[in-house]
Amino acid sequence: MISTATKERTNIDLHNELIQKAEDLIPVLKERSESANADRRIPKETIQDMKDAGFFKILQPKQYGGFELDPHTFSEVQLRVAQGCMSTAWVLGVVGIHPFQLALYDEKAQQEVWGEDDNTLVSSSYAPMGQVTPVEGGFKFSGHWQWS
């Protein structure tokens, strides 16, 4: 009798795959780091590379297409990314931690963010210094914010 069972990918396997993807990305990030610093923004290609690698899904709940892994995996990936470009690692840290935080919210909030598109990225300012004014059809935001 031939077995048709396939080996499921474990969290350890996924952890190792993500670490390897981050290590593979280091040379590319090094090449782009000068332009990232000069332009004061991460190249769109770098954001796409991190999306494709699954870095923003590390802490995202499985029910919304994420890997639901531990913060250790996230920090290990971030440390590897930093070897290529510190600015990129900072952006990964700011944006990549929010799925963990959003997972602590009510299910309704998670559904609003990931219900239609589980690739939605979220970031916020931890130092709310602006003003929000209700306007017809939504809200108007104004003010100046420090780095998130």
Report residues per predicted region.
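Residue-level detector of secondary-structure boundary/capping sites
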Residues: 13, 20, 41, 68-69
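Glycine-rich flavin
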Residues: 42-52, 56-148
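Intrinsically disordered, low-complexity segments enriched in polar/charged residues with Gly/Pro
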Residues: 15, 34, 117-120
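N-terminal capping segment at the start of a domain
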Residues: 25-33
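Basic/polar N-terminal segments that are highly enriched at the extreme N-terminus
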Residues: 1-20, 24
